[in-house]
Amino acid sequence: MKYQYLLLGVLYGLLLSSCSLSAEEGDKEMDRYIANLMGKMTLHEKLGQLNLPSGGDLVTGNVNSAELTKMVRNQEIGGFFNVKGIRKIVDLQRIAIDSTRLGIPLLVGADVIHGYETIFPIPLALSCSWDTLAVERMARISAVEASADGICWTFSPMVDICRDSRWGRIAEGSGEDPYLGSLLAKAYVRGYQGNNMQGKNEILSCVKHFALYGASESGKDYNVVDMSRQRMYNEYLAPYKAAVEAGVGSVMSSFNLVDGIPATANKWLLTDLLRNEWGFCGLLVTDYNSIAEMSSHGVAPLKEASVRALQAGTDMDMVSCGFLNTLEESLKEGKVTEEQINAACRRVLEAKYKLGLFSDPYKYCDTLRVEKELYTTAHRAVAREIAAETFVLLKNEDHLLPLERKGKIALIGPMADARNNMCGMWSMTCTPSCHGTLLEGIRSAAGDKAEILYARGSNIYHDAELEKGGAGIRPLERGNELQLLDEALHTAARADVIVAALGECAEMSGESASRTELGIPDAQQDLLKALVKTGKPVVLLLFTGRPLVLNWEDANVHSILNVWFGGETGDAIADVLFGKVTPGGKLTTTFPRSVGQLPLYYNHLNTGRPDPDSHSFNRYSSNYLDMSNEPLYPFGYGL
């Protein structure tokens, strides 16, 4: 027996050695190929590889549409993003291969954040499943669908730790805990990239936003970040490092300052820490237009900002075209070196090589896959299953849930039949008309056993302009408020139980969606109070991309189920509402009692004067005059 174990050990050791040698030989082959290619490239062609414009199909910033076809022919781009549709992508790739001197293939990127056509729960919701396998499955299916439609690079995962729910992009991350965030970061990378990115279903992952973006002061997007190195290492950097350890192929720098220097041009962050300390050797890309935006920081105009970004370790310039248009002159002036340009170009080419684009430039251009692999029944079933794992039951007085499929159930609220808003933020690649509404899901599940009554009940906000800002690219039709409320109360009067579908609409969380008031929007609060006043039992289905302040709701509503934004939301909520599935979510982010408590998180360091009694004010203790220190719902909570 000992001999068998020894033999197995020797064989295993030889296998590992063989794999190591094979990987090393593969690296040498890549190095030879790229060195040979770069030996043929002009400076203009090298600078072109560093340029990443937006195609303008999908808007993620101020519209900055490049003339892509012209730029491809002129060898002025290394890739592009925000173009959806395999045939458009094939046409651009064909120009790059057939109509340029060296035929270098293009990277094609997209924000595939929580699904492509099949949409899964938003990342914050996914984290509440505490299920790394579920996250990996989501990323794997997203990669399959994106790659089938021509995409080879996703700007995901976002792993920014956030403890302040005023910040809208908390919806894109995994909550407040760095350990859980690290586990989920690795799961995302495994799901997107697979083992080696050589398969047709595997795409390049990009961890973002490096670094500390989730700690933006006052929860305001793009704002300043300032903290000690001790806090950085202990509380914020771990998920980025975990993604690097998992082999993530690219990293996106963040908009914010780190140590008073924009992350885009922060050499300590991008080179000393990321590359030298952590050993990252992949592609480093900026965020949208961030090199140009260094002028707004008061740091430098575009030309000097481009120099600083390159010197700091940036490889690819997203949208600003600073590298393309200014680095040649800066090279002549001695402000950058050819070695720095070559290093950046090499890493862009290495990413393409690792994706297999040099051996098969049309690897992601199989038009037959689109018909077979997007929004499939199997993918939707997985999304529906995972969604129920993310729902968090916050309250269930008298065991009101699950509901019986009998009698009359009133479904009331502006989120009940809002098809455009079911998928949540960062779902621009999907086709909203394909996704079912909550009303459709509940009626389907109830069948002929219960009558489902419906009324919209209210607008999102009383203020039309405020609602317009929150609705973003998914506007909701507004109605007469008195008529909406009257219809809702009439509907409620006929019902045995009321299900209120309320909360944020999809674009009220995500990028550029900071809030100072974190309650359910006012028009919906008024509706909810009127529904509770009827005396009928009320279930609140809470749609949100962030923790909200729910003191009144917790005190007055019978049951509260936080459903986030779940993709296959309608069917998944119906599964839980009628007891087919038990909600499995536990909070990964703290729900405050007041905005004044923020930032609020479970693992805060002790003070020298801890509060001995969190329920009443204690002078000379670390507490508030007017509010308990305790959150409404703590990290890890869920019934």
Language model segments and positions:
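Bacterial Sec-dependent N-terminal signal peptides
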Residues: 1-26
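Glycoside hydrolase catalytic-domain context in secreted enzymes
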Residues: 19-639
